[in-house]
Amino acid sequence: MLDSNELIQQRIQKIEDLKNQGINPYPVRFFPDSKSKDIVEKFEKDPTGPETKFKLGGRLHSKRVMGKASFAHLKDSTGIIQLYATRDDLGEISYSIFKSLDLGDIIGLEGYLFKTQKGEVTLHVTSVELLAKCIRPLPVVKEKDGVIYDAFADVEQRYRMRYVDLVVNDHVRDTFITRSRIVSEIRNFLTNEGFLEVETPMMQPIAGGAAARPFVTHHNTLDMQLFLRIAPELYLKRLIVGGMDRVFELNRNFRNEGISTKHNPEFTMMEAYIAFADMNTMLDLTERLITHLAQKIHGALKIQYGKDLIDLSPPWRKITYTDIIKEYSGIDFSLITSLEEAKKKASELNVDVSKCNTIWKVADEVFSEKAEPNLIQPVFIIDYPKELSPLAKSNPDKPGYVERFEPYVAGREIGNAFTELNDPFDQKERFEDQVQQREAGDDEAFMMDEDYIRALEYGMPPTGGLGIGIDRLVMLLTDSHSIRDTILFPLMRPE
């Protein structure tokens, strides 16, 4: 068996051979007029004769040469179609080119349809043209008795070489087609709800809107430090101040943090804000949006995610932040009065809280390890501690807590929402508290944003805000178990 380097050299030689025959192996243009799936389906219903020609373009998927005649398969973006080519139809030169084709070569074909004795709709090829040589051999995926062999399955290679992954693994292509549908449906849904889609800065002088470490860059002309945005929140709320009552943005955020099955430093977020609304407005919107997406993508509200059947039917369960922690850990953090006591109880559960410097940060670690993985069915976690929510409005009926919720499904958070804090004095105090935490070593604490305070001083109406992680939502709706499976080109270490 030839190794890959020898195969590559053979294929390069075939390119040279074509050039020596005066044939351009990379022609300027070829315009298909049909897709394989469409013409097969139409032919099954209404057969056509040799007078009806079709032009197809795609990759050579398989080939079986039998002297003066050959069978092959072409794969395009819609599916696979069988090909039948003969020396008599193509002529000596073209048939020789057809026989020399390698799997993965991109070719253009013209021909008419017929059915073989086995009943398979087949393109009888009347002309063939090499459009681009597949110099590097593709992995050959074979299936026998329902078992897949030789798949391009190395996860790291798949992520690094997504272009090969998409060619070889149809389910990967399907995931990203579904992702595109989800994004389109979100835009349609929000537009129909009266939202205006806007764009806010990707480079910001102050990294705000979330507790996260930013990526830092520098603008040479202005000689100023800038941050890739960690969230668009503070700019979107400036628009609410300006009288734009319903706005949303669906775009990228960047956070200089770890990489895991749930985190990628570059990710897609949808944030929406409604003036004269509150947390409950956004809770209703979240429930309606996600059930709408499930119906559009799956045609049902019960969807399979791994071994779990998830029922998205409304209404979703609601439970407070402290109660859900107590349910899964036995600790009632609302009764704990010292950091030492909080750390002791967390340590008894083998939760590492060595870097936590407040009671509620200890609680959040316990929540992440003990409660979150168990939140399989959809649930809204409500009534978060004020300390963990610097931009949310205080709950007037529950001192020390805010009007905030996070939706959880399949063991992970998929969003964050609250009644927005619109009191500039309260907001400034919370920013100042965050600055103190930052100076104490918390590099994820918020920075002071004086301009945002100034915007609030002009008056912002009671407002509801919502953020939904698109990548995690796609994970849920495509039964994907790593965020990298929903991002075309996830960040990777250098090879």
Swiss-Prot record:
Its main location: cytoplasm. Mg(2+) 2 binds at residue 413. Mg(2+) 1 binds at residues 406, 413. It is found in: Cytoplasm. GO terms for molecular function: ATP binding; lysine-tRNA ligase activity; magnesium ion binding; tRNA binding. Binds 3 Mg(2+) ions per subunit. PROSITE patterns: AA_TRNA_LIGASE_II. Keywords: Aminoacyl-tRNA synthetase, ATP-binding, Cytoplasm, Ligase, Magnesium, Metal-binding, Nucleotide-binding, Protein biosynthesis. Its cofactor is Mg(2+). One of its GO terms (biological process) is lysyl-tRNA aminoacylation. Gene3D superfamilies: Bira Bifunctional Protein, Domain 2, Nucleic acid-binding proteins. Pfam families: tRNA-synt_2 (PF00152), tRNA_anti-codon (PF01336). InterPro entries: Aa-tRNA-synt_II (IPR004364), aa-tRNA-synth_II (IPR006195), aa-tRNA-synth_II/BPL/LPL (IPR045864), Lys-tRNA-ligase_II (IPR002313), Lys-tRNA-ligase_II_N (IPR044136), Lys-tRNA-synth_II_C (IPR018149), NA-bd_OB-fold (IPR012340), NA-bd_OB_tRNA (IPR004365). Its EC number is 6.1.1.6. One of its GO terms (cellular component) is cytosol. It is an enzyme of class 6 (ligase). It catalyses: tRNA(Lys) + L-lysine + ATP = L-lysyl-tRNA(Lys) + AMP + diphosphate. Homodimer. Belongs to the class-II aminoacyl-tRNA synthetase family. This is Lysine--tRNA ligase. It comes from Leptospira borgpetersenii serovar Hardjo-bovis (strain JB197).
